[in-house]
Regions:
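Short acidic-glycine-tyrosine-enriched beta hairpin
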Residues: 70, 79-104, 108, 230, ...
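A short, N-terminal "cap"/entry segment at the start of jelly-roll beta-barrel domains
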Residues: 1-46, 134-231, 321-359
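Conserved catalytic motifs of the protein kinase core domain
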Residues: 47, 69, 111, 234, ...
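Conserved short histidine dyad/triad with adjacent acidic residue
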Residues: 19-20, 29-65, 86-89, 98-102, ...
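Aromatic/pi-system hotspot detector in well-structured domains
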Residues: 65, 74-75, 94, 100-101, ...
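Glycine- and acidic-residue-biased ligand/ion/polar-headgroup-sensing regions
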Residues: 55-56, 64-84, 241-244, 250-268
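Short, well-ordered beta-strand segments in beta-rich or mixed alpha/beta enzyme
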Residues: 52, 74-76, 91, 113-117, ...
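A short hydrophobic beta-strand segment most commonly corresponding to one strand
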Residues: 96, 109-128, 279-281, 295-314
Length: 359
C-alpha cells in the first residue's frame, strides 16, 4: 500500500484505533498485581475493553460479572479452579463468561497478559463472598483521564471529530511483540504447539483446536468461529485476512486486535498497522479497501456486534449481508462446537445471593 493510497492519513490524529504498545500499565486500585491498558469505555452501554496484566502469583479476584465478558490469553499462564475441576489457560485460550455468573479467581502462574471485553461492570468479592468493590466503564474512563490516555471513540461522529491526541508518555510493549510469530497463539497446529491448554470448563476453548473455515466467495479470509449469540447477534472470531476485503459497511460495531502481520486501510499509514494495535469500528463505519500490506499472514481477533453489509462501492447496490445466522450456519456445517453463550445447568450462573457488603 503506497502513500498515494492513503491521502486521508493523519499521523497526529486520534481515530478508530490505539497502539497498546505505546500505553503504560495502569494499576487497578486495591487489587495487588493487576494493571490494565485501557482501550475503550462507553458511558452509554457500559462496555469497556482493556488488556489486563496479572503479575506472577497475583489473581483476578473471585467476581460476579454483571454483564458478559470475553477474553483471550495473549501471554503467560492462568489457572482456573471451579466446580472441583481445574483448567490451565495458556496463550491462545479464548473464553466467554455470561452475565450474572459468579466465577472463582483467575490465578496467574507467571506474568500474564489478557485481552478482555467487559459488557458491563464486574463486582470483585472478598474472601467471605461479600462485595469488595465494583469496577465499571467509569473507572476505566477515570484511570485513562488521570494518565492522559485518549481512548478510542465510541461513535462514528466522535471518530470524525478526532479530538485529543495520542498518549505521549512512556509505554510498555505487549509481550506478544517480542515473539517471532505472535500468530502461533491461535494458528499453530495442535500437533506442533508447545503451549496447548488444559481446558475442562465449557466457558473456554483452545483456539489451536478450532479449524479455519471460509465463507463462499471469500476464500482468502479464514475464520475460526468461537461464539455466536442468537440473542444479541454478537459474533466472536479469529480472522486470517490474506485477501482484499470487498467494500463494506459495519451496520453494527466491531473491535479487533492485530496479532500478526500488518493491516492496511485507505486512511491509515502506508506501512499498515501491526501487532498490538486495537481497533474499534463504530456502527456505520465504512471500508472500501482493507488488506494485508506484507506477505505475512494477517491474523487478528474480532468481535462483531452486528451485521456487515457488502457492496461494490459507494452508492452501489447491496450485494450481501453477513449476520449471526450466516456465521452460525458456517460453524454448523464445519462441525464446530461453539463456546456457549449461556447454559441452564451452569453452576456458576446465579450461584450467589444478592450482592451486599459485609455487615
Amino acid at each position: 500500500m503506497s502513500e498515494a493510497a492513503n491521502p486521508e492519513y493523519n499521523p497526529s490524529g486520534v481515530g478508530d484505533c490505539i497502539d497498546t504498545n505505546k500505553l503504560p500499565w495502569v494499576s487497578i486500585p486495591n487489587i495487588s498485581g493487576l494493571s490494565i491498558k485501557p482501550a475503550r469505555a462507553s458511558t452509554e452501554s457500559g462496555i469497556f475493553s482493556v488488556i489486563l496484566k496479572l503479575e506472577a502469583g497475583s489473581s483476578l479476584p473471585s467476581s460476579i460479572y454483571l454483564g458478559g465478558m470475553d477474553m483471550l490469553i495473549l501471554s503467560g499462564q492462568i489457572e482456573y479452579d471451579q466446580d472441583g475441576t481445574k483448567s490451565i489457560l495458556n496463550p491462545g485460550t479464548w473464553g466467554f463468561i455470561c452475565a450474572n455468573s459468579k466465577v472463582n479467581a483467575f490465578v496467574a502462574n507467571e506474568d500474564t497478559e489478557v485481552l478482555a471485553n467487559f459488557y458491563s461492570g464486574v463486582a470483585f468479592l472478598k474472601d467471605d463472598g461479600s462485595l469488595a468493590s465494583i469496577f465499571t466503564a467509569l473507572d476505566v474512563l477515570s484511570l485513562a483521564k488521570e494518565t492522559n490516555i485518549t481512548l478510542v471513540p465510541n461513535s462514528l461522529s466522535a471518530c470524525m471529530e478526532i479530538e485529543g491526541e495520542p498518549y505521549r508518555g512512556n509505554g510498555e510493549p505487549l509481550a506478544i511483540t517480542a515473539t517471532e510469530n505472535a500468530g502461533k497463539l491461535v494458528d499453530e497446529p495442535v500437533s506442533e504447539s508447545a503451549i496447548g491448554s488444559e481446558v475442562t470448563h465449557p466457558h473456554f476453548v483452545d483456539t489451536h483446536e478450532v479449524p479455519w473455515l471460509v465463507l463462499p466467495g471469500m476464500e482468502d479470509v479464514g475464520l475460526k468461529i468461537l461464539r455466536v449469540s442468537e440473542e444479541t447477534g454478537y459474533i466472536s472470531l479469529i480472522v486470517r485476512h490474506n485477501g482484499v476485503a470487498a467494500p463494506h459497511t459495519h451496520i453494527g460495531a466491531s473491535d479487533f486486535l492485530v496479532l500478526q502481520g500488518r493491516l492496511g486501510v485507505r486512511a491509515g499509514p502506508p506501512e499498515g498497522y501491526g501487532p498490538g494495535i486495537w481497533f474499534y469500528e463504530p456502527a456505520g463505519a465504512r471500508h472500501d479497501a482493507t488488506q494485508r500490506v506484507t506477505d505475512e499472514d494477517l491474523i487478528y481477533t474480532a468481535n462483531l456486534y452486528g451485521p456487515i453489509m457488502f457492496d461494490s462501492g459507494p452508492g452501489t447496490q447491496i450485494e450481501s449481508v453477513l449476520s449471526w445466522k450466516e456465521y452460525k450456519g458456517l460453524a454448523e456445517e464445519g462441525g464446530i462446537k461453539l463456546v456457549p453463550s449461556t447454559r441452564s445447568d451452569d453452576s456458576s450462573l446465579l450461584a450467589w445471593a444478592p450482592l451486599k457488603a459485609s455487615s
